[in-house]
């Protein structure tokens, strides 16, 4: 998820669109009316133009999670970019991961904090290692010659949005192509956007403590569909939506998941006083009936360890069953304990 998260990034957002639409992306979020049945009504939405003109602390996060495959196997790439304003101080941070199905986790330059010299919040500031072109509504490019990679994302389609009094949270997905080394890898991006005001200035330092057992899975089906869910027991980000939510895009049909139930069947050991989720059984309901997902982490990297908790990314495989069809899945898991 964007936040203590990672994964791919991008954007030059239009501020007027942000302040006048439920979400930030073109088109209405699918099944928004039925999705609203599962949450309390919100008063809003947040006026982003007015917020930017004010002096309140502001936090903005863009998260792109890419999954693709070519004849050499699967590749996963994710970047999360966070910007904040606290008084006269403007910051920028990037979290980046890259994984090859056969080579494992690949070192990528450009992770960490960097200077936000232009005091940019809506647009992702260029860093020494990454440049950003375009916008999410019309297509965006993330280019890093130093790392030998270039991610091109088609215009984003909104799948779910949660406008609030002090926040905007949107989810989208789109086709994407990653050029890495001598490979051209076609796949999908699942995108998360957060704009929140009055966030604690301690968030960036202690972001993991804002979550309780957060699990976010960003999956691509073998036939090019999307599946996303997140679950958390914490209440710190309740305004951004239910603690359990998700969507699927199968056969070109986009739906918000209803009656979503997530069960962790197995946990693995961590270096500390906690355990990582390792295998899941997930069930839900959509227009064509019930669906199930079985998934497991097959490779994992610990990004941060707080001893009482931590932050990790994992590669996930498994099967998704819906409407009489069983689809293999491959993707990324973001885990915060």
Language-model features: where?
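Hydrophobic membrane-insertion alpha-helices, especially the h-region
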Residues: 2-14
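Structured soluble/peripheral alpha/beta segments that form catalytic or ligand/cofactor-binding pockets
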Residues: 14-337
